[in-house]
Design a protein with these regions (language model features):
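Glycine-enriched, solvent-exposed interface loops adjoining structured elements
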Residues: 1-245
């Protein structure tokens, strides 16, 4: 759906649902509602409890097709810094647009001789296990206090400006590459160039990045949000909490 089609169909649906009683919306206002609708739909699709089908990303092949256009893969082989939470860890800067990590693994150089990092080494692939800080504390209370032989731990952190992952490997491992596949946050839907205002720090027109199969859902959701904003009553907002995705 083009930006013009989004705008035109928004007007039709909005006027129908409001019986032409509400004032018209300009392109900026429609862009705000469309972008909010897009973000809500993406988040609800990834949270099984947030949609009527009770299915997350891996629960339905259609979900993977729907979001294939904002799926990214990358590997990071440099720029590692020492861990701030765990002395064994290495901190990796990840892309700022990461919305949800799908899967990840690490490549490490492993010393073959236990306890001797200068011995002949081999390259090993480790499955990364994402953990939160509560889980980290629990694991550190155990006798071995380290990941299993073929695993590494990952903690997420943020210094206020950049998103970071702290990768914790075993005592004989040296991190060489971090591989990640993720869903990026879709860019804002901006129907036309903006003057005097911004949306997600952008002023130029931008199209919807999601698969066209989702465009009608985004449009319908945006109109519902606009209606609730105009009516402003509690019941409308409660109904919006009952996700239709």
């Amino acid at each position: 759906m083009t930006n013009q089609e989004f705008s035109n169909e928004f007007d039709v649906l909005y006027n129908n649902i409001m019986s032409n009683q509400a004032p018209g919306l300009d392109e900026y206002e429609k862009s705000v509602f469309l972008t909010k609708a897009q973000d809500e739909i993406v988040k609800n699709y990834f949270n099984p409890k947030g949609n009527k089908y009770q299915e997350g990303f891996d629960g339905n092949e259609k979900r993977q097709i729907d979001f294939s256009m904002i799926m990214r893969s990358t590997k990071i082989s440099s720029g590692f810094t020492d861990g701030v939470f765990d002395s064994r860890g290495k901190v990796v800067i990840i892309d700022s647009d990461v919305m949800m990590i799908l899967n990840e693994y690490a490549t490490v150089t492993r010393a073959k001789s236990e306890g001797d990092t200068n011995s002949t080494s081999e390259t090993v692939r480790l499955t990364i296990v994402p953990i939160n800080y509560t889980e980290y504390s629990r694991l550190m209370s155990k006798p071995y206090k380290r990941p299993l032989k073929w695993q590494a731990w990952r903690l997420l952190t943020n210094d206020g400006t950049t998103k970071k992952a702290e990768i914790i490997v075993g005592p004989n491992d040296t991190l060489t590459t971090y591989h990640i596949r993720y869903i990026k946050r879709p860019q804002a839907i901006i129907l036309s160039n903006l003057e005097g205002v911004t949306l997600d720090n952008k002023t130029t027109a931008q199209k919807c990045e999601l698969d066209p199969i989702l465009h009608q859902e985004i449009l319908q959701r945006a109109v519902e949000l606009a209606k609730a904003a105009y009516i402003g009553d509690l019941n409308s907002n409660i109904e919006l909490g009952k996700r239709s995705e």
